[in-house]
Swiss-Prot record:
Cysteine disulfide links: 345-348
Name under which the protein is recorded: Alkyl hydroperoxide reductase subunit F
Family label: Belongs to the class-II pyridine nucleotide-disulfide oxidoreductase family.
N6-acetyllysine sites (modified residues): 53, 354
Source species: Escherichia coli (strain K12)
Annotated cofactor note: Binds 1 FAD per subunit.
Binding residue positions for FAD: 214-229, 478-488
Subunit structure: Homodimer.
Function: Serves to protect the cell against DNA damage by alkyl hydroperoxides. It can use either NADH or NADPH as electron donor for direct reduction of redox dyes or of alkyl hydroperoxides when combined with the AhpC protein.
Binding-site residues, NAD(+): 357-371
PROSITE patterns according to UniProt: GLUTAREDOXIN_2, PYRIDINE_REDOX_2
Length: 521
């Protein structure tokens, strides 16, 4: 199951175990059970602190296995294959169970240990999902730290019947105590906040105690990370707040145009950015979103950022780097069937539609790439483009047109998502040339029509254009003194990762120039 390189790496990790780990498998006669048995046996051979045994009498999913300590039944369970993107989740579960500490903040770990209540989590994932590991790892860690928290990570490809029965049409999909809990990427902090009543209030109280910053960067994607590094290198008090470190690149799989890095993945790049930021004295505030900007009353005064949790942070200068989010179609049925057939991530959710008919909305690079990827999984793909021609690179268009199970419809205006009350069953569109209405029967709709800036919270505070982008000059200055902006949330042309990082650096230098030239009020 594991090649020589993987075994060598895993053996090195297992040397960090400080207490014994037991792998308890519950198997049947399936081929998948045989694979898991082989995998666990190989892992046990790599360390004298790891043992493996079978107990097929347990009333749990088959095949599955528990990662625990001898004499205990506490710990995370994997049902199905833990390979692909989830192999890292498996390795971390082994380390945490074996006594190796998590890198999460001690205050958060203590909060998890003291959560009062019984919670049985189930997370459905796909092996190609790059968003799933964050959720699986967060819940695995919680199950290691708190005996009243159980977690089973379930491979949707192995347990397809459960995917169908529960109408899971997007991953990661999390259930707690048998009820839907959440869909999509969630951080450990966000999960804890949802089950630990009072956590948000405590977080706000703690943030309110923080001293004013010289520069506070709102948004922790590439632009925000670059701004934080450049600011901290100037020796000024720097804060960096955001909902999730990495921002939109966490939803990007392959990145091949970040100069000097021939190929990487969004999560890897986000991780590298975090490591770089952590090299400097930056106060990183995770899982916090801004709800309002209150500009300083006088030049040189303190600007205020109100957070969604109710906290107020103050700073002499602000850099807004809140990025953008997926654009919606804004048609009837889209909201109702979001995660029930309407999705925005072909890499995460594509495997859930294996053998089914789907549509991709949008003929730009992202839409055409999605259609190409999906064509190798699903029965049939219909790509609908609003304009008379696709905007994707010609090499991508040529590849798409070569695929036999893909139809391309131009001048198509999507008008409605059709459903049966629980899931998507079709799509309605209007031919923009003839005006005729057409219906397509399908199970999934992948929306790839661009991005919208995350700037609604700035209403009335800074000038924005009709698209909602923050209007900036060549130095990333807004119309408000001491407030700067960078990246995809601004009017800067071409929304690219490398451009965002450059703009973040520029905004930081401009903010520093403002600080040294402006007398404190």
């Amino acid at each position: 199951m594991l090649d020589t390189n993987m075994k060598t790496q895993l053996k090195a990790y297992l040397e960090k175990l400080t207490k014994p780990v037991e792998l308890i498998a519950t198997l049947d006669d399936s081929a998948k059970s045989a694979e898991i048995k082989e995998l666990l046996a190989e892992i046990a051979e790599l360390s004298d602190k790891v043992t493996f045994k079978e107990d097929n009498s347990l009333p749990v999913r088959k095949p599955s296995f528990l990662i625990t300590n001898p004499g205990s039944n506490q710990g995370p369970r994997f049902a199905g294959s833990p390979l692909g993107h989830e192999f890292t989740s498996l390795v971390l579960a082994l380390l945490w169970t074996g006594g190796h500490p998590s890198k999460e903040a001690q205050s958060l770990l203590e909060q998890i240990r003291h959560i009062d209540g019984d919670f049985e989590f189930e997370t459905y994932y796909s092996l190609s999902c790059h968003n799933c590991p964050d959720v699986v790892q967060a819940l695995n860690l919680m199950s290691v730290l708190n005996p009243r928290i159980k977690h089973t990570a379930i491979d949707g490809g192995t347990f397809q019947n459960e995917i169908t029965d529960r109408n899971v049409m997007g991953v990661p999909a999390v259930f707690v105590n048998g009820k839907e809990f959440g869909q999509g990427r969630m951080t450990l902090t966000e999960i804890v906040a949802k089950i630990d009543t009072g956590a948000e209030k405590r977080a706000a109280e703690e943030l309110n105690k923080r001293d004013a910053y010289d520069v506070l960067i709102v948004g922790s994607g590439p632009a925000g990370a670059a701004a934080a590094i450049y600011s901290a290198r100037k020796g000024i008090r720097t804060g960096l707040m955001g909902e999730r470190f990495g921002g939109q690149i966490l939803d990007t799989v392959d990145i091949e145009n970040y100069i000097s890095v021939p190929k990487t993945e969004g999560q890897k790049l986000a991780g590298a950015l975090k490591v770089h930021v952590d090299e400097y004295d930056v106060d990183v505030i995770d899982s916090q979103s801004a709800s309002k900007l209150i500009p300083a009353a006088v030049e040189g005064g303190l600007h205020q950022i109100e957070t969604a949790s109710g906290a107020v942070l103050k700073a002499r200068s602000i850099i807004v780097a809140t990025g953008a989010k997926w654009r919606n179609m804004n048609v009837p049925g889209e909201d109702q069937y979001r995660t029930k057939g309407v999705t925005y991530c072909p890499h995460c959710d594509g495997p859930l539609f294996k053998g089914k008919r789907v549509a991709v909305i949008g003929g730009g690079n992202s839409g055409v790439e999605a259609a190409i990827d999906l064509a190798g999984i699903v029965e049939h793909v219909t790509l609908l483009e609003f304009a008379p021609e696709m905007k994707a690179d010609q090499v991508l268009q040529d590849k798409l047109r070569s695929l036999k199970n893909v139809d391309i419809i131009l001048n198509a205006q999507t008008t409605e998502v059709k459903g049966d009350g629980s899931k998507v069953v079709g799509l309605e569109y209007r031919d923009r040339v003839s005006g005729d209405i057409h219906n397509i029967e399908l199970a999934g709709i992948f929306v790839q029509i661009g991005l919208l800036p995350n700037t609604n919270w700035l209403e009335g505070a800074v000038e924005r254009n009709r698209m909602g982008e923050i209007i900036i000059d060549a130095k990333c200055e807004t119309n408000v003194k001491g407030v700067f902006a960078a990246g995809d949330c601004t009017t800067v042309p071409y929304k690219q990762i490398i451009i965002a990082t450059g703009e973040g650096a520029k905004a930081s230098l401009s903010a520093f120039d403002y600080l040294i030239r402006t007398k404190t009020a």
